[in-house]
């Protein structure tokens, strides 16, 4: 298996790039999150890769971070999700945004990704629950309401609020807020609504 590729970036045609490694050019498909952070053509590039071997082709997918690659691998384990759809998910949202959507069970966020319908989004949420964990790093940079969003959500649901109301209230809770403080802030937001 090819786990990493380092060389000179020769071409950039989204979502495919061409990387020269000692005279051999490798075509690598990358998510748009990786594509936008690539160096200019002619410069050195290092990518973590995932090789997919099919009956008719050997396809190489590249990622700048270990979190992107491990998320790609988790997506491939889901029934009905192939490499193209997994790449589309990572192109349409960051790993942190996907992790947040799974934590909050936000199917609407996933359906904004081209090619993901309601049923597929629900299947992704169901099968990814509890799998996007510590190896994906913190949700920093995402619009994450809180590190304890799931606990806060469950508390609000137990208090009788609808999921829609609870999710709207949680979005106002800053990252790093504890559960009890997050519940207080959410209840304050709900009382103003």
UniProtKB/Swiss-Prot annotation:
Region span, Domain I: 1-64
Compartment(s) of residence: Cytoplasm
Record carries keyword DNA repair: yes
InterPro entries hit by this protein: DNA_helicase_Holl-junc_RuvA_I (IPR013849), Hlx-hairpin-Hlx_DNA-bd_motif (IPR003583), NA-bd_OB-fold (IPR012340), RuvA (IPR000085), RuvA_2-like (IPR010994), RuvA_C (IPR011114), RuvA_C_sf (IPR036267)
Region (Domain III), start-end ranges: 144-193
Keywords: Cytoplasm, DNA damage, DNA recombination, DNA repair, DNA-binding
Record keyword Metal-binding present: no
NCBIfam families, alphabetized: ruvA
Cited function: The RuvA-RuvB-RuvC complex processes Holliday junction (HJ) DNA during genetic recombination and DNA repair, while the RuvA-RuvB complex plays an important role in the rescue of blocked DNA replication forks via replication fork reversal (RFR). RuvA specifically binds to HJ cruciform DNA, conferring on it an open structure. The RuvB hexamer acts as an ATP-dependent pump, pulling dsDNA into and through the RuvAB complex. HJ branch migration allows RuvC to scan DNA until it finds its consensus sequence, where it cleaves and resolves the cruciform DNA.
Domain observations: Has three domains with a flexible linker between the domains II and III and assumes an 'L' shape. Domain III is highly mobile and contacts RuvB.
Name assigned to this protein: Holliday junction branch migration complex subunit RuvA
Organism in which the protein naturally occurs: Burkholderia thailandensis (strain ATCC 700388 / DSM 13276 / CCUG 48851 / CIP 106301 / E264)
Gene name for this UniProt entry: ruvA
